[in-house]
Amino acid sequence: MREEIIKKTERFMQAEISKLAFFQDNTPRMAQYRMEHSYRVAHIGAEIAAAEGFDRERTFVACLLHDIGYSLDYRDKQDYRNHGRYGAAIARPFLTELGYSGAEVEEMCYGIAIHVDDMADFEGERTPLALTVGDADNIDRFDAYRLYEGLQNVDYMNLPLREQKAHVERVRQRLAELRQMPCGTATATRMWQEKIDYQLEFYRRLGHQVQTSTWPSEGGKCFPDEKPLL
């Protein structure tokens, strides 16, 4: 990858994400997190590209820019769903200035546009590179940091035990469904399933802990498939 291209892309991404107009609780830390996430997605994308044999630099650049659409002033949840399409529009002239061909720019922008909800507002091809933008985003969103963030977002520590149990079960069911989600490449599929399996194991262990956090009360059973304690 060309260092000059990467450095220019870094500066552009940082300038756009620093705006973060979407977040009402905008703080320097919120912007910093979004930048950190973008870097992780870029590294994941480059790893996928290297394993699959397509352009690492363009994949890295597209992934690094995937969330710059957050810099606009949004009014509702639909605007949030559009942030990939908005990001593609912001990225297009910048990518052209970097010297990429028209076809290369469109492929990268298509990947940025579809990474949220698999839809774009312009025609494009679902190439491995384009699909990798969304795949890399999802892979990072289901890694270790989001375990912490997911529990923090529901104030898990302060939930009553019954609600903690219910939350764990809901998450486990959802993760089992998400594990079947198709990815654009074999490498992304492997990485995705590894992340989901990691979370499933965490929530299996957490579920065991919350189930054993009180004395059995229904027929002397800790678990539905256990014999009553004597």
Which residues does each predicted region cover?
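Acidic/histidine metal-binding catalytic segments
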Residues: 53-61, 98-112
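Amphipathic alpha-helical segments in well-structured domains
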Residues: 83-84, 88, 129
